[in-house]
Regions:
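Short Lys/Arg-rich amphipathic alpha-helical segments
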Residues: 1-173, 177-211
């Protein structure tokens, strides 16, 4: 199976831009709330809107360093609710849920593939490559505009593949023991490095990671 070729250069700013975008009502919500989230010092990961009355509006967000806690989620929720009430990207009642991306997180930025290189992921393409849309394997980062993965293809040895971001419809980490350990270790290090924080994570921090 051949790598899908694309040659682009990407700045560090572009590497943190989301390339996975919502559609429909979720896209309308994103256009309203993303500037608010960024003004609070966080970044949007993913939005999902489900149900009818009330609609469930699920928002995944995080700090630029990948962390977030329950207090952060409550702060963001309080800021977003009045914005949604005023701008009304949809009609009717809704319930707002703000959370972390979780350990088996969606991968929505080029930097996500770099940050979690070496861990397993599932990737779904918007159109088939060599007759298939779904791939699973070990992330090998992001290079020349492509997501790199050592893919398991059923028979034979895994193959090094690359997919341009324009083809990525969905990408998510696979929950493994190694991923859980790595995520918790990273969170502890970042938590202990913040001014005014102790070296230990509390139960809320761990719960946020596991959501």
């Amino acid at each position: 199976m051949a790598t899908v070729p694309v040659k682009t250069t990407m700045s560090s700013a572009q590497s943190t831009d989301r390339f996975v975008r919502e559609s429909g009502i979720a896209a309308s919500v994103a256009s309203v709330i993303e500037p608010v989230i960024e003004s609070l010092g966080f970044r949007l990961v993913r939005i999902q809107v489900s149900g009818k009355e009330p609609r469930i509006v699920q928002i995944m967000t995080e700090r630029p360093d990948g962390t977030i806690n329950i207090d952060d989620c409550e702060k963001i929720s309080k800021q977003l609710s009045p914005v949604l009430d005023v701008d009304e990207p949809f009609s009717g009642a809704y319930r707002l849920e703000v959370s972390s991306p979780g350990i088996d997180r969606p991968l929505v930025r080029p930097s996500d593939f770099e940050d979690w290189s070496g861990h397993e992921a599932k990737i779904e393409l918007s159109e088939p490559v060599d007759g298939r849309k779904r791939f699973k394997g070990v992330l090998e980062g992001f290079e020349d505009g492509e997501v790199r993965i050592l893919a398991e293809l059923g028979e034979g040895d895994p193959q090094h593949l690359g997919f341009p971001v324009a083809l990525i419809a969905e990408a998510r980490l696979v929950l493994t023991d190694e991923l859980i350990r790595e995520a918790l270790n990273r969170a502890k290090k970042k938590h202990s490095g913040r001014p005014g924080d102790g070296a230990e994570m509390d139960e809320d921090d761990v719960a946020d990671l596991e959501d």
